[in-house]
């Protein structure tokens, strides 16, 4: 049984110290595509946490029975099954959000973070550790996603969760929206500034 300190490290380390987007530069595509609104970013975060945690758990449980030659296929089959489950739940209970997320829920199957943790960690670790590692990496991914979405939605439209925060000029207020922040390239710049900020606070993450 894994000790509490180790589990805490697995849960919290990916959020700041070993963030999958900010340090490992993984999962960038969805960070560009689903961060125009906080709502979609949060839903995507929960979807990735669910898929990463349970794929890690199931792969770890059967890791000793998976032939090395087909391990990637087995991993993808498990991940794909979980992604289909998430997609069907969204279609049933949050159809509007499902439409907004479009193909990007399905593309969780090929998300480097999910595949990377399955191969690098779950195949070599105990089930509980693997499950917690999946949650931690999902949280780390989500922290960047939500941060980017917060900035993009607020500056781009003056809203958060679709509710007006800054009254726009068009509605008789003072705020002029900046449509640039609603375009995908803006997410690149925001992520770049976040990475710069993290590495300023943590110089040990700067590549030599």
Swiss-Prot record:
TM ranges: 42-62, 70-90, 103-123, 131-151, 178-198
Topological relation to the membrane, as annotated: Multi-pass membrane protein
Location(s), subcellular: Cell inner membrane
Pfam families: Rnf-Nqr
Gene Ontology BP, a term: sodium ion transport
Catalytic reaction equation(s): a ubiquinone + n Na(+)(in) + NADH + H(+) = a ubiquinol + n Na(+)(out) + NAD(+)
Keyword vocabulary terms for this entry: Cell inner membrane, Cell membrane, Ion transport, Membrane, NAD, Sodium, Sodium transport, Translocase, Transmembrane, Transmembrane helix, Transport, Ubiquinone
GO MF, any single term: oxidoreductase activity, acting on NAD(P)H, quinone or similar compound as acceptor
Coiled-coil regions, chain positions: none
Top EC class, one word: translocase
Family the entry assigns: Belongs to the NqrDE/RnfAE family.
Listed HAMAP family: NqrD (MF_00428)
Subunit structure: Composed of six subunits; NqrA, NqrB, NqrC, NqrD, NqrE and NqrF.
Name of the protein in question: Na(+)-translocating NADH-quinone reductase subunit D
Source organism of this protein record: Pasteurella multocida (strain Pm70)
Lineage: Bacteria, Pseudomonadati, Pseudomonadota, Gammaproteobacteria, Pasteurellales
Gene behind this protein: nqrD
């Amino acid at each position: 049984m894994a000790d509490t300190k180790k589990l805490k490290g697995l849960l919290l380390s990916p959020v700041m110290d070993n963030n999958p987007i900010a340090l490992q530069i993984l999962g960038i595509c969805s960070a560009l595509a689903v961060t125009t609104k906080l709502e979609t970013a949060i839903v995507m975060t929960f979807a990735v946490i669910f898929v990463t945690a349970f794929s890690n758990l199931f792969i770890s449980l059967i890791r000793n029975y998976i032939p090395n030659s087909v391990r990637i296929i087995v991993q993808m089959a498990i991940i794909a099954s979980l992604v289909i489950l998430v997609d069907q739940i969204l279609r049933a209970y949050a159809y509007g959000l499902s439409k907004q997320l479009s193909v990007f829920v399905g593309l969780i199957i090929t998300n480097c973070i999910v595949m990377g943790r399955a191969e690098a960690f779950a195949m070599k670790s105990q089930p509980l550790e693997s499950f917690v590692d999946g949650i931690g990496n999902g949280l780390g991914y989500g922290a960047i996603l939500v941060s980017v979405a917060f900035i993009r939605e607020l500056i781009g439209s003056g809203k958060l969760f679709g509710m007006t925060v800054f009254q726009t000029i068009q509605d008789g207020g003072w705020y002029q929206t900046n449509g640039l922040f609603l375009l995908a390239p803006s997410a690149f710049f925001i992520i770049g500034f976040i990475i710069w900020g993290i590495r300023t606070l943590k110089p040990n993450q700067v590549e030599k």
